[in-house]
């Protein structure tokens, strides 16, 4: 598939030909489940203009059906463009196709979608990761030039890692969340999934910047990164030794080899440890589910979306939510409601917020001594469907990504190796808040080292 950088040089006729080619490929690969079944209308308008960018199904695109892969939003049509979509259009890009996802971005396998699961292009028996699994699978399968996803606890980086592409989560507040269906408002962040690091920088530059429509948007002027990329910068990189040592043998081996390559390339490597990852999991799932229980309370069948039959208002709420929300979403909403209840608020939610502050300080302390942090994306390669049937086991697959969201830092997933079964292994680079340039420079150098 043509890269985003190459696509910028195309004429209008060549872009039209690219859109037609993509539409044909998407229709021929429906079994992959990367795109939601609705393959007609403006979302795949081959006669439109603009370089095509695949869009996760929780980002508002005017006149599109946008459902967050949930039954409860069937029939909802977005009345406006999200800020990132407005920015795409202004820069000569265009939304092109809705990608599949875990329902309301709650999951790490893209199995909980109302539309059915997405497969991993490398091995159809394995998960593509999630929740932005459709976006990652589309890019990896060559049926998207690039895509937008959202990352609440690793939902861009982990599927990018499992599918073998680049996934970039900007600093919290760097990219506007206006028009993103909220899961956890203090953790959600939109970002690119691309074929390479340069493309990630290009797409990031398009969508980044202050937005008055988002109260959490970073107000300082954004300075573009793509035109300043430097793959020759020598950096101090902190390896999180305890996290590397916890991973499965094949992942650990690939990470250790990559560390040696970084040393050989002239980077200074220091070794650090972070707080036991179980604290990240506990704090994240308390905070995220608490915010989700509030955010998803707006879906009641009254104003928009699917509505169940009922004889009174309470019955309408109960029936609509019972039929509209999937099992995982209901589980997280119940957990969130529980931790916010009067008897448990201090015991759980307040403690989780204190833990979050401590986790953030830990990352910042390491980044006072280093330019970047190096750690795994996941403990293993992509696992088989049904392998992690217990929800708690599935939650642990995000163990190395969620801390970054709790700290609000920028991070990128870069492919570093394949195992004996040709499955992808990636590493994660994390930087200081709002210093995306260093993250992208380090990632570009790592990409160059790996590709030789």
Swiss-Prot record:
Record's catalysed reaction(s): L-glutamyl-tRNA(Gln) + L-glutamine + ATP + H2O = L-glutaminyl-tRNA(Gln) + L-glutamate + ADP + phosphate + H(+)
Enzyme class label: ligase
Quaternary context: Heterotrimer of A, B and C subunits.
Protein name per UniProt: Glutamyl-tRNA(Gln) amidotransferase subunit A
Catalytic site positions: 56 (charge relay system), 131 (charge relay system), 155 (acyl-ester intermediate)
Superkingdom classification of source: Bacteria
Biological process terms in GO annotation: translation
Taxonomy of the source species: Bacteria, Pseudomonadati, Campylobacterota, Epsilonproteobacteria, Campylobacterales
A GO term, aspect molecular function: glutaminyl-tRNA synthase (glutamine-hydrolyzing) activity
Keyword RNA-binding in record: no
